[in-house]
């Protein structure tokens, strides 16, 4: 079963995205912040991690290292506002994150998993 971990998404986005995923038979786990998300990863296998940029407190490479230690090989997508500077997008992509503009749809997230 495909399962997605949503980290730090606002309530409306998490609910909308969660319901859209459930309609497609995709499980959803929700964490308020990265620390809670890492704790979830210790006990729950996921296929994809989706984190809101505003919840990432470390630099892109350090944050990528934490996710890689907690869930090796699991793809991490970072949602960012559409008006974010290109430099922020590039830094995240160079660290290995998939960068998607908010609001995100399940199809955007799941395309690389297919």
Question: Residues of each region from the PLM?
Answer:
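Two-component/phosphorelay signaling modules centered on CheY-like receiver
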Residues: 10-30
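Conserved phosphotransfer microenvironments
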Residues: 47-70, 80-88
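C-terminal output helix
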Residues: 104-113
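Acidic, metal-coordinating helix/loop segments flanking the phosphotransfer/catalytic sites
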Residues: 32-48, 56
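As written
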Residues: 91-100
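Conserved active-site segment of CheY-like receiver
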Residues: 9, 79-83, 103
